Amino acid sequence: MIDLRYLALVLAVTDARIAIAQQSSPTVSPVSTTVTVLGSSAPISLGESARTAIVFDTQQNPLEFESVEDYLRTDASVDIQQRAPAGVLSDISVRGASFEQTLVLLNGLRMDSAETSHFNLDLPVPLGALGSIDVLHGAGSTLYGSDAIGGVVDFTTWKPEANALRLRAGTGSFGENQQAVLGALVGKRWSEVIAGDRDFSTGFIADRDYRTENASTDTRLASPLGTTELLLAGDDRAFGAAQFYGDYNSWERTKGWFAGLTQQFDSHVQAATGFRRHSDIFLLERDQPTGYKNQHVDDGFEGSLRDRHEIFQNATLLTGLEETTDHIESTNLGEHGRNRGAGYGEAEWRIPGRGSISAGLREELFSGGRWVTSPMAAATLWLPHSFKLRASAGYGFRIPTYIDLYYSDPTTLGNPNLKPESAWNFESGMDWYPTPRIAASLTLFYSRQKNTIDYTRASSADPWQATNLSGLHFAGVESAVDWRVNRNSQLKFSWTLLTGAQSALHGLESEYVFNYPVNDARAEWRWTPIHSLFLDSRLGVVQRYQQTDYPVWDESLSRESGRFRPYVQITNLSNTGYDEILSVRMPGRGFVGGIEFAITRKR
């Protein structure tokens, strides 16, 4: 079980520090008014949502985190399984679902790779150019399609309100150095954001070096046609992959290109299209470049049209059409392609201050003639004393990636006979808003899966084999408290307990699905001790299935105003030895420090 002494230590320190900063402030924003774009037919405040959703404002304190994974870790229901820092090959799962069962979006457009879901978090947009991260807990296939079994994560780019220039440079442990640049221009009817960043490290052990580069340009324009947004982005990541895929000192390099165009014609109709291309070069043994080698190039196209209308007072109908194509050329997998089209609708009736009810249905047709139907229903009910009850049910599905189907190397074998996986998800919960500064939630959830895709083997002498598991289900409880003490201090706590049916393995070893946390507790304290200084302290204690618990404590301190803004980020302050993926060791205590030069001028 989780050793709560770690949490007690942080709470004791926190209470002492808060006493210094206590003061009343009417400017603190109510917790319940934060708006999410996920889980509903229209953007909605968290206080009115029938689903569990988390929103991170990545522009509020831009120097506190090094990567998007650091933001996501503060949610106890989100499990980040990282192989290296700086966003190098990270897996994400929600509520115990596998990393392949979580859909990642960028400005509402799919970022999934037809090759493998290991690359879903290969975001080509620099962290500084993002504005928010929305996380939906539970199935979302009715609105978002394949892969949204365990949850959905949507990264949204930043919309500037003033001209800005930011230049940043830093250095730290393990030979790390980082640079970033961002420029923003704002006109009367347009805006432009250009950003780039680079992160390099010689590695904390041999063959764990990395170099990541990201660049993007984001253009917004208002015209008689409506509001247009064009996002162009690319990334390049090269890294040592020691023990990533077995007992080999491997090496890998990936590149990504993304183009997304969104056209909001009026308050009702939106059209969007996106193109994503991803390449991957993999050497099984780094010191043998002429040995076992794979090269993959996959691309995907997506087009969508949405219409949202108020059909009568307080009732909204959302309808949409989507078309998606995937294609891959690979030295290992061969050449393959597939496409699918979908139509969906969701109706929602909301009575202000009383509650809401919604229902939706999606019909999706895949090449080859397979139809998938994805229904959902949700409801909320407000009770006296600021209590809100909520419940939802939904169906999610996922088609296998090409790695799942066709891959073959000395350690891993695909399976061309794999069936698509699916799940019914149910949840019920209660939210409480005793004051505008406090929000508390408790949620019970259950997921009944069918044909879950995992890689299994009888013993360590055998290769991993892709297979469908039957009879797998998860049940759990998640809780969270967000307390905005005053304008200078905020406390956040979350805890998720998870259990599941393990008989699905039938005595086999599991590579991915059974690496989920059975206990995950998170505590975060955000504090501004004096004007412009910002301190963020984060503690996570995780216990994975059939493993011992481990604590990881991170701290960051930065200046958040002025032209020159020094910062320091300390990771794994407790110097814990741990791995988030079996046998892939994570770094011990490390730090990065530097300075940012920033200018902001409003028109």
What are these regions (language model features)?
Residues 201-216, 225-300, 412:
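Flexible loop and strand-edge segments within Gram-negative outer membrane beta-barrel domains
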Residues 245-266, 296-298, 382, 395-449, ...:
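Outer-membrane beta-barrel signature, preferentially recognizing the C-terminal barrel domain
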Residues 110-137, 156-158:
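Short acidic/polar hinge/loop motifs at secondary-structure boundaries
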Residues 38, 69, 73-109, 131:
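Extracytoplasmic beta-strand/coil segments of soluble accessory domains associated
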Residues 182, 220-223, 391, 512-603:
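Conserved C-terminal beta-signal and adjacent last beta-strands/turns
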Residues 318, 351-354, 445-448, 468-542, ...:
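Gram-negative outer-membrane beta-barrel transporters
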Residues 140, 152, 156-185, 195-206:
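Short strand-turn segments of transmembrane beta-barrel domains in outer membranes
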Residues 32-69, 91, 99:
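N-terminal periplasmic "start-of-domain" segments of outer-membrane beta-barrel proteins
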